[in-house]
Amino acid sequence: TKAINYEMKDELITEKVGCIIAATGYDLMDWTVYEQYGGGKYPDVITSLQYERLLNASGPTGGHIVRPSDGKEPKKIAFIQCVGSRDPSRGRNLCSGFCCMYTAKQAVLTKDHIPDSQSYVFYMDIRAVGKGYDEFTRRAVEEYGTEYIRGRVSKIYPDGNGQYVVMGADTLLGTQVQVTVDMVVLAVGIEASHGAAALAEKLRISYDHYGFFMESHPKLRPVETNTAGVFLAGVCQGTKDIPNSVAQGSAAAAKVLSLFSRDKLQNDPQIAHVDIKRCVDCGKCIKCCPFGAIKEEAFRGQLKAKVIDTVCQGCGVCTSTCPQGAIQLSHATDNEILAEVNTLCQF
């Protein structure tokens, strides 16, 4: 159909929009830092995404599983999970969320492609929490003969005969394990997309210490952000698999459509307001506002702070920053809050 234009060049486009859906996805972490796995050094130690391309009919090998080093068909394959996930020693405590399932899928497909093959999966815990997920992992073991070994891999090295020795521990049996395989597949942990932090600064939205965008409320507003009109979809908000990403994308689209169906938008009445008599134009509120909702405006020959009502989200950062107490939140002024505290202290 010639739907893809291979000659297309980068183009800068400027548009005015009413809503933005951030769906920046994720990137794989730098797996070469795990030198004990031979990442980037041994040609037959590859990532799960690279192995996925080998399994794909449109991939470089037409769906045939071969070793990158010599093009031979592997008979024994070791899958190592949690490479860069749940690893406090490297400051990576989060679980990538979907590695357990795609590893089981790849082990099943390997058996379909190479019936006389044997797959070994080194894992920490099997986190199969979705619909039908646990049943699928059981099928991988019971019907396809995948051998699961609970424990970390300590080292991978070539044995000199074209194969690789995988050394680890079986924590269930309390013994050392040594497996000789033809190929090793690493389930590499994910991280926030490169450039996500810069985008968050432009959109004026928060992000956590892993770099994933923060939702407005984890239960009640999971696709919204603290900036009105900016929504989240997919892994940019946190680790999730394809069904959850599709569901969140649909929810974000529904939120946008609900805004388009209205003639007028309603803003939260609890916004900041400025007492121009007390304002000395120090500029601290302008610098601290995460939404850019405060500007300078001339009043009787003097510059004063001015709150843009339609932009203010009522977060209250400016009220706690102002040294003169010139900015207050509507229905939550200092006097009102202190009156509530004094009343509570009477009981």
What residue ranges belong to the model's regions?
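Residues forming the flavin
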Residues: T1-F347
